[in-house]
Amino acid sequence: MDNNTDFPKAGFARLLKSFENTDDVVKLTRAFGLATKVHRGQLFNKSEPYINHALRVATILVEELQLRDCELACAALLHDTLEAADEDLKEYGERVHSIVSAATEPKVSAEEKAEILEQYFRKISQAPKDARYVKLADRLDGVRSMKGKAMRAARYKEETEKYVTPLAMATDDRLAFKLSVALYELR
């Protein structure tokens, strides 16, 4: 089995097992479909289909943290769709739309990045807990996927330690611990 290309089917099936309500399954299937469409042809870390990342973010929340919340899982699946395309997420409900909007990092040039990141993480630290959960699960998957990519990992690790670790500590001890372990494993 090629993990990079088979993961979307198996990973999504595994995600759905946590939800018994038919309406939840339909919502998750629609969100997964849109995320798959938006990210078609895109690679995460230049090495695997981008949808794998979105699925792992949802799985971190649903399986690792046991947050069995359909709208939160939909937001996790869709968390990078606003960055990739100008999608209207209102059809997924106001809560999903606001979580994704809050978790979306602004696109900036390299010169503006430090200042904008400072503002962004200040804003997200004041955002509802759901948005912080999605952002933290997103970063946790990003850190975990940096193993073996030393050049890129150094900058990502520094940014994570400066902005994301304090956010994790203020949001959920379990996420803070998982993030600390993932950062340690980058050494």
Region annotations inferred by a language model:
Residues 1-187:
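Active-site helical microenvironments for divalent-metal-assisted chemistry
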